[in-house]
Amino acid sequence: MMHPTIDIKTFLKPGVRAHLAGIGGVSMCPLAEVLLGMGLIVQGSDMTESDTVCQLRAQGIDVAIGHSAENLKDCDLVIRTAAIHDENPEIAGAIARGIPVYERAQAWGAIMQHYENALCISGTHGKTTTTSMATHIFMAAQADPTVMIGGTLPMLHAGYRVGKGDTIILESCEYCNSFLNFFPTVAVILNVGEDHLDFFKDLKDIEHSFHAFADLVPQRGYVISNADDQGAREAVAGLSHPVFTFSLADRTADCYARDVAFFDGCASFDVMIHGQLYAHVDLHIPGKHNILNALAAASAAYVLGIPGQAVTRGLEDFHGAGRRFEHKGSYHGAAVYDDYAHHPAELHALLTTARSMGYERVICAFQPHTYT
């Protein structure tokens, strides 16, 4: 893998031509739109035609189908997805011509430095749901955020939005230490467990990665961590600045839930911060674990000055993200849900949630996915 010696930030200016290899990808399409909005000339390539490709072309972005060194034209830099390796003809062509090649995460890391607030939400589980919750809250507060989510959010009809506000919200993945390319002003750690063991050596290695991620936060920023999770506690131990904690019931935490009640599997509770009522929340997605996700999103909103009313309104309107216990309909009277859970801990939370909803029988069809 080639490591450019020129900081990608030097290219983020009007008139620079950027080629995005794999431009139709879930986080490459919004990247293209953000770069276009910054005044860059954006072009790219993808393997197939798609609605995303059509959407990019409608904005004046030249998208080639198929990968070829000829697609590079006279570009100044190349940005690629993780799925595109050095053997790809565009990457090989760029290297041969001395055109710097950057990873997608490097580009997002450079972009977030243009925002006053960079809210990066990490964790072994719950990232997509919590990032979606935070998006609803900041939208309710009319903060007009730029958002990058690893799934589809019905409110956006996509997994991203490009806003004009001073906040960017990103789902931040630890795989291959990707999130260490970021520059968070607020880093959220939901939980830390064994995952991606094709890359990490063991749990300690994973905890070290999350610690390094939290350590990226400047002194003026905030690290928000789950006080109920052992791995998260280990990850933030020894940080040079204070940690803002959230908990389901520990009243010594900065943020905790009070008066929790369940209705058809969905929780209703008060969000308490420093012993004071910040917001009341009525969730419309089931599961005890989603209380913690909501507390994490509320904590991030609080430290960034969002009023509690926006938390209440935003979560009132949140009905889940795509493939996160997503109700698809019914079959012969049985409710059918789709969920991306593929880690043992995620499966446990999923089945516990389903059983809490009063169904007489729960059947799970599971397709193994990813190394873990």
Q: In which residue ranges do the predicted regions lie?
A:
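Cofactor-binding loop segments of dinucleotide-utilizing enzymes, especially the Rossmann-like FAD-
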Residues: 23, 47, 124, 150, ...
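Beta-strand->loop->alpha-helix junctions that form or flank phosphate-binding loops
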Residues: 45-46, 64-67, 103-109, 148-149, ...
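Structural beta-sheet core signal
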Residues: 20, 44, 147, 187, ...
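Phosphate-binding loop of NTP-binding sites
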Residues: 9, 34-37, 57, 71, ...
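Nucleotide phosphate-binding/pyrophosphate-handling subdomain across enzymes
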Residues: 3-19, 27, 31-38, 263-265, ...
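Hydrophobic beta-strand scaffold residues
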Residues: 42, 63, 98-101, 145, ...
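N-terminal leader/targeting and accessory segments in enzymes
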Residues: 1-103, 107, 222, 256-258, ...
